[in-house]
Design a protein with these regions (language model features):
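Short, well-ordered beta-strand segments in beta-rich or mixed alpha/beta enzyme
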Residues: 2-8, 39-65
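N-terminal first-folded block
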Residues: 3-30, 35
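Generic alpha-helical hydrophobic packing signal
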Residues: 3-9, 21, 51, 55, ...
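Short phosphate-engaging motifs
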Residues: 14, 48, 70
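An amphipathic, aromatic/His-enriched active-site/gating alpha helix that lines ligand/cofactor pockets
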Residues: 28-36, 55-88
Length: 95
């Protein structure tokens, strides 16, 4: 299993638009083969920080997701709504 934790920094004026785009991404992704979990959260202390938590059956399933047309479309469209590149951590469970 592969876990991804991605942290994005949103602009306040475009937060709702980016959340809508993220909702579309989640709705499509959870149907994708190999996706175990794909959730979006807002930081309680800073609502302009969004955290995506993903779990995939394998690295191959994750790669299929990140190479998909819909993923590239939403990521490229969302670039104008974030203040810096997302922090992405690809993790493996150790305990």
């Amino acid at each position: 299993m592969v876990t991804v934790i991605a942290k994005s920094y949103l602009t306040e004026e475009n937060r709702e638009r980016l959340l809508e785009m993220s909702k579309q991404l989640v709705e499509i992704t959870v149907k994708q083969e190999g996706c175990i979990r794909y959730d979006a959260y807002l930081d309680e202390n800073d609502p302009n920080i969004m955290i995506m938590v993903e779990e995939w059956e394998s690295k191959e399933a994750l790669n299929n997701h990140t190479n998909s047309d819909y993923y590239h479309k939403i990521v490229s469209e969302s670039a104008e709504y974030i203040t810096q590149m997302p922090e992405v951590h690809i993790c493996k469970k150790v305990l």
